[in-house]
Amino acid sequence: MKMNLKRLVVTFFSCITFLLKFTIAAAEPPEGFPEPLNPTNFKEELSKGLHIIDFYSPYCPHCKHLAPVWMETWEEFKEESKTLNITFSQVNCIESADLCGDENIEYFPEIRLYNPSGYIKSFTETPRTKESLIAFARRESMDPNNLDTDLDSAKSESQYLEGFDFLELIAGKATRPHLVSFWPTKDMKNSDDSLEFKNCDKCHEFQRTWKIISRQLAVDDINTGHVNCESNPTICEELGFGDLVKITNHRADREPKVALVLPNKTSNNLFDYPNGYSAKSDGYVDFARRTFTNSKFPNITEGELEKKANRDIDFLQERGRVTNNDIHLVFSYDPETVVIEDFDILEYLIEPLSKIPNIYLHQIDKNLINLSRNLFGRMYEKINYDASQTQKVFNKEYFTMNTVTQLPTFFMFKDGDPISYVFPGYSTTEMRNIDAIMDWVKKYSNPLVTEVDSSNLKKLISFQTKSYSDLAIQLISSTDHKHIKGSNKLIKNLLLASWEYEHIRMENNFEEINERRARKADGIKKIKEKKAPANKIVDKMREEIPHMDQKKLLLGYLDISKEKNFFRKYGITGEYKIGDVIIIDKSNNYYYNKDNFGNSLTSNNPQLLREAFVSLNIPSKALYSSKLKGRLINSPFHNVLSFLDIIHGNGMPGYLIVIVLFIAILKGPSIYRRYKVRKHYRAKRNAVGILGNMEKKKNQD
């Protein structure tokens, strides 16, 4: 028996191995599939645009598994590649060993992005799928830096720093800020030098990124420098960069590190870049610019804040990133009553604010309540666009209730947003509590509308779930001028619907607070009638009524020209087009793509979109009784079995409950029959017989 089982197992695995070999061998190239590049045509082909190149060995198992994926990717993308001017190519490193040696290829397969000047970055996503490769191609084809030939021929502005030079910086002797990179080498005098980095595959691509950073920051009078950690082990180890001094784990890849040194300061002047490694320059540049600007606590005027809040933002632009989607944290004080100690809190905010993108710190010597009230009134001008409907009224009492504070305090304004926020600083205690202030800042730290992609969806879903119930995603496209213009209009409609919903949400909050007040007053009245002790009455009167600020919306837009496989990746089923809106319930990961009438959810009709928000979060205020039907993200079930989503959403406990119920239904009748038989049997055994119950007779004597 054991021998037969062993033979079966061996036969099974032999079949699997054969099938795998057959599958790999059967991967025939599609018609027109290009031959691998070689030393003769490599540079000529690179001169024609962007190239994603697979450096492979025909004897490498991983390369063999990648081969059919690469062919499918090329075939599906070949027409789009002509439009985007980016090509999928290959190099056989057995036939072109010298070429692979010149390109420092250390393992197979290695997938790299090249432009006419040479290597830009590596593709490091796993698993390597057709979808991830195509998404990478689309993303990189739209990055203007990748085709900037002037940049590639230019030199880096970064200065080589000896250990003594860096110590001078942190001693406060610099007059300009320095963004400094740290490298696992001792030989890099110029950051453009061609070097071999051990266990640092990302170092080569970051050299180009660092050049971009150095040139962009030079415009802002921010210096850049680089430190060789192998030459300065003590400094790097003290900074927590010990892995750049020597290899501690040969299997782990190392990454360059970056830190900012502020000038003319001997303390609180060194800040590590907080967001981890990236081959993109934007995050580093924003970090350096904002942190340096924030460290100066610049003044701002009411007029400047009003202009920023009233700004009409185009979230999509034909060139470059959106530059006016910022958040402004303003320290507001009365010059007649402020004391020098009140300003100390600003120094403690520099470091935590450096970790939040797009947030700027300012100060102003006046109360901004009137500005906040006036801006809030502008929101009602926007949402009262339909004269045929009942005009919505600004609830001044609710506004006052949510802006009670004393000076000094903090206000927060967002570009393009008429809604501002006031920190509840009722006393000096709150205004000197850095944790309380940062908790409040983080709660409102998302920009007005955020670009959603595969890298940040999960982060947005988990962001402040107690306050923000839903994430609304507008689908747009940035393929050309016409689409960009139309997409900006769609995002503005999304904003309009969200402001209408915000009015209803605030009115509902106000009603709930008044109900709690009435219940509290009724409770006080009752205990007074019962002639309760004075201390109990006082305790009841001191009970605080919580002002719950929940069921808010997070807004985002998804560029489907960049993220065509986004829906498949996250298991969001259905056919989608530009203009559609997807609402994700952040509490249970359900998504909704139909309105109250079963039609595709879009922002073309802001009122229907508003009603979708209301139906999900405040059904008692909804105009329509019909409920929205949602699906679970990454549900394993077909639409026909969507009722099973609730089981899958509860994970293992959900399936265990179903199994228990199934067993109960299956075994229930037989268990019940056995129970009846046993009960009947016990009843027969307890029969008294012809002599009667002897114990009873004894009791009768």
UniProtKB/Swiss-Prot annotation:
Reactions performed catalytically: Catalyzes the rearrangement of -S-S- bonds in proteins
Signal peptide positions (record): 1-27
Primary location group: endoplasmic reticulum
Protein EC: 5.3.4.1
Assigned keywords, A-Z: Chaperone, Disulfide bond, Endoplasmic reticulum, Glycoprotein, Isomerase, Membrane, Redox-active center, Repeat, Signal, Transmembrane, Transmembrane helix
Annotated membrane topology: Single-pass membrane protein
SUPFAM superfamilies the record matches: Thioredoxin-like
Keyword Isomerase in annotation: yes
Cysteine pairs bridged by disulfides in the record: 60-63, 200-203
Segments forming domain Thioredoxin: 28-142, 408-446
Misc remark: Present with 6020 molecules/cell in log phase SD medium.
Family the entry assigns: Belongs to the protein disulfide isomerase family.
Record's protein name: ER-retained PMA1-suppressing protein 1
Organism taxonomic ancestry: Eukaryota, Fungi, Dikarya, Ascomycota, Saccharomycotina
